[in-house]
Amino acid sequence: MHVTTIFDTVPVNGASPYEVVIGSGLTPLIAERAAGSGATQVALLHQPALAEVAADIDGALQAAGLQVLHLEVPDAESGKTLAVAGECWDKLGAAAFGRRDIIIGLGGGAATDLAGFVAAAWMRGVRVIQVPTTVLGMVDAAVGGKTGINTAAGKNLVGAFHEPDAVFIDLDRLHTLPDEEIIAGSAEIIKTGFIADEEILRLYESDASACLQREIDGSHLPELIARSVRVKGSVVSADLKESNLREILNYGHTFAHAVELREDFQWRHGNAVAVGMMFIANLSYNLGLIDADLLERHRVILDSIGLPTTYQGGVFDELYEGMTRDKKNRDGNIRFVALTAVGEVTRIEGPDRGELIRAYEAISS
């Protein structure tokens, strides 16, 4: 049996405080938390590739006296649809799933987003425990209470704020991930470095390979995950519903979401965020907000772990249309989260279209 080891615990305060537990061998703690919630049933939402992991958690839940209902959903963004959510609700209804019962979201960011949305809507809100299994899910999607599904109009335009009961980040799951998943998820970690924690950037600059290493000994990844979660936890504790401060977590995301829409959600989110950060860094440089060194620092760090720094997949007009749909926009103006220095965030509102074209040309040539 794998020994349970806790690496760090990050509190997320606010209206409904919870903890993010980071460690290894956490399945017993997941079952203990669910059993202590007063639930009689647990709905375990997961993707087909995680059937074996789900079976392990199922066994622990049943040993704790809980009935387990499996909600197997399609992989990645294809599972984040109203149709899939509807199928989940139908199964909950057939099982007489009650208000005291609990949903567990097991998987990457798409699975935890969907689990949170299904939980938020069922009986106007039941509890959810998030168990992210990808780097992206660990540092971004599973923390903060944002849930959602995709529609033809765009990504995450339908959703709800629904804070989890707890988040368990089991570092053992890193061993199951392909290299490209760890690389793509690292874009969100790097993002938090630029907006709030320069030590994250220094770790990548000191030894990029250690930042991707799965084995705990000698790896920077556990510390990077913990630091990134701590940044996000601090931000969402102060601003759950994205009224102001939480917007800083969208650094690089305005252009990223346009890319994802253009690519019909077939691009990895982290890769889109990487080119999104390069886009806003170039725009900020052209507007005199940052210097050439900070612009180059973006490129060097992203490139050091194999993240894309250019994008040639669409004409500007298509991407511009995607940016006009961004949730941060106000009064018809496209709004960008930008930097003036590492850890110093500002906003760019309604920039000249010519400047946007110039920034796009810099990353598409």
UniProtKB/Swiss-Prot annotation:
GO molecular function, one term: metal ion binding
Places the protein is found: Cytoplasm
Reactions this protein catalyses: 7-phospho-2-dehydro-3-deoxy-D-arabino-heptonate = 3-dehydroquinate + phosphate
Record-given protein name: 3-dehydroquinate synthase
Gene3D superfamilies for this protein: 3.40.50.1970, Dehydroquinate synthase-like - alpha domain
Residue numbers binding Zn(2+): 188, 253, 269
Pathway named in the protein's UniProt entry: Metabolic intermediate biosynthesis; chorismate biosynthesis; chorismate from D-erythrose 4-phosphate and phosphoenolpyruvate: step 2/7
Pfam families, per the entry: DHQ_synthase (PF01761), DHQS_C (PF24621)
NCBIfam families given in the database record: aroB
